[in-house]
Amino acid sequence: MSSKEQKTPEGQAPEEIIMDQHEEIEAVEPEASAEQVDPRDEKIANLEAQLAEAQTRERDGILRVKAEMENLRRRTELDIEKAHKFALEKFINELLPVIDSLDRALEVADKANPDMSAMVEGIELTLKSMLDVVRKFGVEVIAETNVPLDPNVHQAIAMVESDDVAPGNVLGIMQKGYTLNGRTIRAAMVTVAKVKA
């Protein structure tokens, strides 16, 4: 009998038996490997989780830095804007006594005297041009009467009885006040009306 003709007791050729056994082993191997967890898979999953966490931290850090830079840019712009607005404050404060002197000169000048008219006119023009110049840079005069006393722009010097002005309102200006771009640089010294006793 040749090897091809040899039959096993069940009547199968040896090659068929080997093939059947090989298929059974292949069928069993996936079940065994499914039960066993490869440590490399755990490590890969752990590393992927760490990577995702690191990426999230990095994204959050970048967003925080961007927000901080934007806030810094805004603060810098505001600081520059304030510096531009109020850079003249010291200079204006030095000019205020000159303006006050011109005001006082006009108050005491003898306007009825024809010999003084040229000088009075010169003082008036000088004061007007000086006020026009400072107004261009955001300076406003606080000199209104019969308005409610505002502690932000008025400094009450005295209380005076009055029938003409409502109590608590500004009766008279003793010294003009000034604001620079809405901020008081010198409060007006005023007298305030009160009810007659």
Swiss-Prot record:
<dbReference type="GO" id="GO:0042803">
    <property type="term" value="F:protein homodimerization activity"/>
</dbReference>
<dbReference type="GO" id="GO:0051082">
    <property type="term" value="F:unfolded protein binding"/>
</dbReference>
<dbReference type="GO" id="GO:0000774">
    <property type="term" value="F:adenyl-nucleotide exchange factor activity"/>
</dbReference>
<protein>
    <recommendedName>
        <fullName>Protein GrpE</fullName>
    </recommendedName>
</protein>
<dbReference type="GO" id="GO:0051087">
    <property type="term" value="F:protein-folding chaperone binding"/>
</dbReference>
<feature type="region of interest" description="Disordered">
    <location>
        <begin position="1"/>
        <end position="39"/>
    </location>
</feature>
<dbReference type="GO" id="GO:0005829">
    <property type="term" value="C:cytosol"/>
</dbReference>
<dbReference type="Pfam" id="PF01025">
    <property type="entry name" value="GrpE"/>
</dbReference>
<comment type="function">
    <text>Participates actively in the response to hyperosmotic and heat shock by preventing the aggregation of stress-denatured proteins, in association with DnaK and GrpE. It is the nucleotide exchange factor for DnaK and may function as a thermosensor. Unfolded proteins bind initially to DnaJ; upon interaction with the DnaJ-bound protein, DnaK hydrolyzes its bound ATP, resulting in the formation of a stable complex. GrpE releases ADP from DnaK; ATP binding to DnaK triggers the release of the substrate protein, thus completing the reaction cycle.</text>
</comment>
<comment type="subunit">
    <text>Homodimer.</text>
</comment>
<dbReference type="GO" id="GO:0006457">
    <property type="term" value="P:protein folding"/>
</dbReference>
<dbReference type="InterPro" id="IPR009012">
    <property type="entry name" value="GrpE_head"/>
</dbReference>
<comment type="similarity">
    <text>Belongs to the GrpE family.</text>
</comment>
<keyword id="KW-0346">Stress response</keyword>
<keyword id="KW-0143">Chaperone</keyword>
<dbReference type="InterPro" id="IPR000740">
    <property type="entry name" value="GrpE"/>
</dbReference>
<dbReference type="InterPro" id="IPR013805">
    <property type="entry name" value="GrpE_coiled_coil"/>
</dbReference>
<keyword id="KW-0963">Cytoplasm</keyword>
